């Protein structure tokens, strides 16, 4: 996905939870730092996942393991400067070679696609996307209060 913002700004959007919470998860217990274990929460669904930060290369790469408690997989973001814009790719690997693994891979691909689209609209237009919130409207907790 091409995001028309500088690489440092796009990279920070995925490493600083105060920014990421505008377009993807709703809370993280800390920012990404090498070797850190943290929790990302999607409050609207009452869902969280534990994350291990394996590598960070400022403005170039993020490598994590996530879903540490249930079928962990590796996720890698790469950031490539293209003039005043940044090309971002997300790879998610390590799924089981089974029907359940295939289903999990497809669901993850959908989620990361929404996260990239959300990052693009937030960073380029300062519009809070509600893609993640609106993906499963029937599963949103009745007590959830969006930032809108």
Locate predicted features.
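Hydrophobic ligand-binding cavity/cleft-lining segments
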Residues: 1-29, 143-148
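A structural detector for beta-sheet-dominated domains
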Residues: 4, 33, 41-43, 80, ...
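A short, structured loop/turn motif at beta-sheet edges
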Residues: 7-8, 54-59, 78-87
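Hydrophobic pocket/interface hotspot
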Residues: 10-11, 20, 38, 53, ...
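Residues at helix-coil transition
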Residues: 15-16, 25, 58, 117, ...
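Glycine-rich portal/gate segments that line the openings of hydrophobic small-molecule binding cavities
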Residues: 21, 27-68, 74, 147-148
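Beta-strand/loop substructures that line and gate deep hydrophobic ligand-binding cavities in soluble
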Residues: 65-114, 119
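Short, highly charged C-terminal tails/helix-capping segments
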Residues: 121-148
